[in-house]
Amino acid sequence: PGNSIDTDVIIPARYLKLVTFDRMGEFPFYDERFNSDGTQKEHPFNEPRYQGANILFVNKDFGIGSSREHAPQALMRWGIKAIVGESYASIFEGNCLLMGIPAVKTSKESIGSLMEILNTNPETEFTLDLDSKTISYSYPQNGGKRVVGIDIPEPYRRALTEGTWDSTRMLYANMDKVRQTAERLQQIRGF
């Protein structure tokens, strides 16, 4: 937790040299998680109770800084499938969308409540519903359910729910049209 977590913290610069993103999931928050001798520091990603979690709860201005694409790649390859926070750097938010990761927003108070529930009851299962723009969970003690409203720009929500976030897949699915357009463009004809 904390405000203004930049992409250099999410994925240290030395891991940008990897030729592919395949191993990127080993390194999110690496310098926050490990000492220079390789021993573990106290960090939520190192805690057994959070292993396998796929929703990341963050505070304000998450993903600021250089906005490197490697940051959401590292989180996705760690297993994060959605991020819920107060606010994001716009480029980071867009990079998340391009990988199919919803980066949704909610109030500071709601984030605080969600983090508190997670901290005291790490077994709590959260459900993110982009159609209803909610995140819900049940209280483990009594089975009571709580629903929290989220915000996501409508074009992002539609892209994620309709599967149009993946521009590469869309290009391949429309390859005939791509080729027709390429033939009309003299500057790329023959490539």
Regions picked out by a protein language model, each given a short descriptive name:
Residues P1-F191:
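Fe-S-dependent hydro-lyases/dehydratases of central metabolism
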